[in-house]
Each structure stands twice: as structure tokens, then as C-alpha cells.
Amino acid sequence: MDFETIDPTDFGTSLTGIGINLLVRDVQAETRFLTQVFQMQGHRISADFAIMQNLSQLLQLHSDGTYFSHSLLDLLPENPPRGAGCEIRLYHCDPDQAADKAEHAGGMVLQPPTDKPHGLRECYILCPDGYAWVPSLAIKS
């Protein structure tokens, strides 16, 4: 599927499983953050929308303005964090590399890379919009 040229209706009807759609203040800034810190690929990037790809998984970014008539917009806090209580986990994403890049890209490392009892090395990073991203890799024995 060519994400740069696909018709919006064809894209929407092709989605399956669970989808993640994040409302952000600045789509292009969030795209840069996700690309720089987590090596995601951005597609159809505009001021209002982007398709982000992490391995085979997709998520969508929408600007606040695209939800101008949606009741969800009224629930967003004026200041981050926006995603309190939600972790967006990125498996097979190096937490040490992500943590090294996060602050330079405008994020904040909440928890540095740590080996966890469940077999993953992970860290917690807040993006400028306040969503918690958790890159992780299996601990090498």
C-alpha cells in the first residue's frame, strides 16, 4: 500500500484491529519527534494529518483543529500531558538510543533505560504533547 497516494476512503476502510489516533497541537513537530527519537516513518505529512509507521504498525496524528466540531476536543487539557494513564509501547525499539535522542528532540525521559523483570529493557519518554512512549527491547542474556 502506498501511503503517500492512497485515497482517504481506501485507507480508512483498509484499517483493521486496534487503531491509535493521537490529537496533537502540531502534527509536523510530532512527526519530527517520532522520526528522530523512534525512527518511525511519516507519510502524507501535512499541518493537519500524518500517517506514522512503526515496523508494520500504523498510527495517525491529527491536529486539534481537525476535531473542531468533535466533542473529544473539549476534553483535552490546555497543557500537556494529554495522554495521562496511557502508555504507547514500541517493541523492538532500542530504549537506550531513544533516550539519548529524546531531550534533543524536545521530549523528556521520565524513566531512563532499565532492565525489567518481564524480560524487557525499556524507558519512558514524554513527547512535547505529553504522551508516554515506551521503547523496549528484549534483554540480551
Protein language model annotation of sequence segments:
Residues 1-19, 40-90, 99-126, 137-141:
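Vicinal oxygen chelate
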